[in-house]
């Protein structure tokens, strides 16, 4: 697969909407999370050309993206998504597009003046699935837990 990585600011919301729609479905399926408001905000920032990040293109079509923001002296990786991320891979080495996108983001943040720390919480990815680019750059990893407590009533009072 020949994938080109380009600056996200070259694209419009209409270019990325199908990908973000797929991502919203994955958030709903995996985390019971309504990602639609976040997706709409991302698309607005893309149209305003103010969201730094990268898009992965295959045969002229966007197949993945990642973005980051600057927050004081740290860079925060806001998201990483590649079409088909709902398909679970057997090993972390089977994520070539994710790996390339993250490598570009990490390198950009490392070269950004005043940035002394990089953070990311990529919740839709299984633990360790996309860790390789971080670990290769000597990043310290802190485990996180995503916990769910069903609050729906079971029909009983009290």
Model segments located where?
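Short, surface-exposed acidic/glycine-rich loop or hinge patches that mediate macromolecular interfaces
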Residues: 10-13, 71, 125
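Short, charge-rich amphipathic segments
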Residues: 21-40, 60-70, 112-119, 130-131
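Acyl-donor-binding surface of acyltransferase catalytic domains
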Residues: 86-87, 91-158
């Amino acid at each position: 697969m020949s994938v080109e990585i380009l600056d996200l600011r070259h694209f419009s919301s209409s270019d990325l909407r199908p990908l973000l729609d797929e991502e919203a479905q994955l958030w709903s399926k995996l985390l019971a999370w309504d990602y639609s408001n976040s997706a709409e905000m991302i698309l607005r920032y893309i149209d305003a050309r103010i969201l730094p990040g990268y898009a992965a293109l295959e045969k002229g079509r966007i197949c993945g993206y990642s973005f980051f923001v600057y927050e004081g002296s740290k860079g925060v990786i806001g998201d990483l998504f590649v079409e088909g991320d709902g398909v679970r891979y057997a090993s972390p080495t089977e994520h070539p597009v994710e790996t390339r996108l993250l490598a570009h983001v990490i390198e950009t943040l490392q070269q950004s003046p005043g940035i002394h720390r990089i953070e990311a919480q990529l919740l839709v990815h299984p633990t360790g699935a996309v860790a390789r680019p971080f670990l290769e750059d000597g990043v310290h990893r802190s485990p996180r837990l995503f916990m769910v407590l069903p609050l729906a009533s079971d029909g009983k009072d009290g």
